[in-house]
Each structure stands twice: as structure tokens, then as C-alpha cells.
A protein has these predicted regions:
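N-terminal pre-domain/capping segments
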Residues: 2-150
Length: 150
């Protein structure tokens, strides 16, 4: 693996050390990202996107309907045809369990909420693990969809 790849032997990022519980934050110490204008020195602020600013009769939020792609943002590991994965996701223990799927979904929605993003896309297997048969796969998807609909 590349020397630029994150180390997974660190106790804070080792997947086997995951201890998140319902209600825990995945992105602690990061509040909602808001518009602060182009002069802001806050790197966690919008400089040009002001959701409520009116442009030609609509708000920026109406014109720019941002969405997050679940697979690329929360499942992708940063690999490409030229190398091994370069990212670890601290909320992802890399198992195909419902518990891990729920954790990924909670991390995604916390992220999107803090950015003010209202839309997302996913494929069925992105959000729910495949089961031993079609009935189990469908049950897994139904369980995760119940969480996604909240």
C-alpha cells in the first residue's frame, strides 16, 4: 500500500475498536455549515452559497439542489485502477452486517444534515448487506430503508 495511505493500526481508526452507539456523533465538534460570505476565514463555512439568497425569483437552495452519492461518499475507499484503497472510514468496520449498514447510514445523514443537503442517491446494495438468499437480502434492505425514511 502507498506510504500516503492512512494507517489502520492506530487505536482510533482500527475498525475492530468501533464503539458508536445510537445518538453518538460521527463528526463531533463540527456544527452546521452555514453561509459566512467570501471574507470568512472559517474553512467550515460557505463562502458563496447562501441557501436563502434570492436569484431570479428563487432561492439558491431551489436553484442548486445538491445531493450526496452514498456509495462514493460513504462506501468508497479511495482506490482506483492504479492503486489500493487510501481511505479508512472510522464508522465502517468493513463487515456486511446490518449494524454496520445502520452506522454508515447514521454517519451519512449526520454529514448531510450538517451541510444542509436534502437529497441523496444510493443503490440497494450500497445501503444494505446482501443476504444468503433473496428473502434475507430484501429483509436487510427493508430494515435499512426503515432507518433512511426517518
Amino acid at each position: 500500500m502507498s506510504s500516503f495511505a492512512p494507517k489502520t493500526d492506530d487505536a482510533t481508526t482500527t475498525p475492530s475498536n468501533l464503539t458508536w452507539k445510537e445518538g453518538d456523533e460521527f463528526f463531533p465538534n463540527i456544527g452546521p455549515i452555514s453561509y459566512e460570505g467570501p471574507a470568512s476565514l472559517n474553512s467550515l463555512s460557505y463562502k458563496h452559497y447562501n441557501a436563502k439568497e434570492m436569484i431570479m425569483g428563487k432561492t439558491m437552495e431551489e436553484w442548486l439542489r445538491f445531493g450526496v452519492c452514498f456509495w462514493h461518499t460513504f462506501r468508497g475507499k479511495g482506490s482506483d485502477p492504479f492503486g489500493a484503497p487510501t481511505m479508512t472510514r472510522p464508522w465502517d468496520d468493513e463487515t456486511d452486517t446490518l449494524e454496520n449498514a445502520f452506522r454508515r447510514a447514521r454517519a451519512a445523514f449526520e454529514f448531510m444534515t450538517k451541510l444542509g443537503i436534502k437529497y441523496y442517491t444510493f443503490h440497494d446494495r450500497d445501503v444494505a448487506p446482501e443476504g444468503k438468499n433473496i428473502d434475507e437480502s430484501n429483509a436487510n434492505l427493508d430494515a435499512v430503508v426503515d432507518l433512511l425514511e426517518k
